[in-house]
């Protein structure tokens, strides 16, 4: 994707010719931008939508901030957390067209409700790896329980995203006064601002409390942790709620 973006940038730089007949659009001042933000954020229904969908993206953000360290600390370096990040876009690519067609005639709030009901199930699924005593065998293949439940949980997140994405901007535009739909659609993405701040801070807190860095533990506890990663014993009690 980075290579494709670079090629596109070069093509635009070399071949794009601006339309000389096009009129120059008026640029909003800072005051006008702030006035538009106040108009949007003072709408209680719109603000509620921002905060609700921020919770959705915060769960996903918290996962991606915490997942690499969580996998390495609980399963070991044999398991590559960077591969887990590909599951969500794969699920979205496979199912987004089908789900978008399915919810095409739904009310926006119904599609959003389905997504909001699914997203906590993804967190429960990923936490359920602690219920397994050993590796999971599927079609003769042994899979670490963290890997198995991560795949399930991230897949649920991808499906939830397919239900949310086609409709939440439509619902946001419905809250706007006539002629202000563009302003509301622009500020609808404020949800990611709140989501990433919360997800970033919360992921660090959860890791430190429930899945600490092995190097910060007592030598005996670190040795027990290293042995557990090699399958030579249980995880120390410091990781019992991870």
Give the positions of each predicted feature.
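Helix-to-loop junctions at the C-terminal end of transmembrane segments
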Residues: 94-114
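Short amphipathic helix-loop junctions that connect adjacent transmembrane helices
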Residues: 65-84
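Loop-to-transmembrane helix entry/capping segments in MFS-fold secondary transporters
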Residues: 78-79, 147, 176-191
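Symmetry-related core transmembrane helices of the 12-TM Major Facilitator Superfamily/SLC fold
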Residues: 1-14, 241-242
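Juxtamembrane intracellular "pre-TM" segments in multi-pass secondary transporters
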Residues: 21-50
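C-terminal ends and interior cores of transmembrane alpha-helices
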Residues: 117-142
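Intracellular juxtamembrane helix-capping segments at the cytosolic ends
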Residues: 71, 162-177
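Pair of pore-lining "gating" transmembrane helices in MFS-fold secondary transporters
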Residues: 39-66, 155-159
């Amino acid at each position: 994707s980075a290579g494709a973006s670079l090629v596109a940038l070069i093509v635009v730089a070399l071949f794009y010719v601006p339309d000389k007949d096009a009129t120059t659009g008026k640029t909003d001042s800072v005051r006008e931008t702030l006035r538009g933000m106040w108009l949007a954020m003072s709408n209680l229904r719109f603000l509620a939508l921002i905060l609700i969908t921020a919770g959705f993206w915060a769960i996903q953000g918290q996962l991606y901030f915490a997942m690499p360290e969580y996998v390495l600390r609980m399963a070991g370096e044999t398991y590559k957390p960077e591969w887990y990040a590909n599951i969500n876009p794969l699920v979205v690519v496979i199912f987004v067209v089908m789900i978008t067609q399915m919810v095409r005639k739904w009310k926006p709030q119904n599609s959003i409700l389905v997504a909001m009901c699914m997203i906590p199930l993804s967190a429960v699924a990923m936490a359920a790896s602690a219920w397994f005593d050993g590796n999971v065998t599927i079609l003769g293949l042994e899979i670490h329980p963290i890997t198995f439940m991560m795949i399930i949980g991230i897949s649920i997140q991808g499906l939830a995203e397919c239900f949310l994405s086609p409709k939440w901007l439509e619902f946001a535009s419905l809250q706007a006064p006539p002629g202000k739909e563009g302003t509301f659609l622009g500020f609808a993405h404020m949800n990611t601002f709140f989501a990433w701040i919360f997800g970033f801070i919360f992921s660090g807190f959860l890791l430190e409390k429930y899945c600490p860095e092995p190097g910060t533990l007592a030598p005996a506890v670190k040795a027990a942790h290293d042995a557990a990663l090699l399958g030579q014993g249980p995880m120390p009690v410091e990781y019992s709620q991870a």
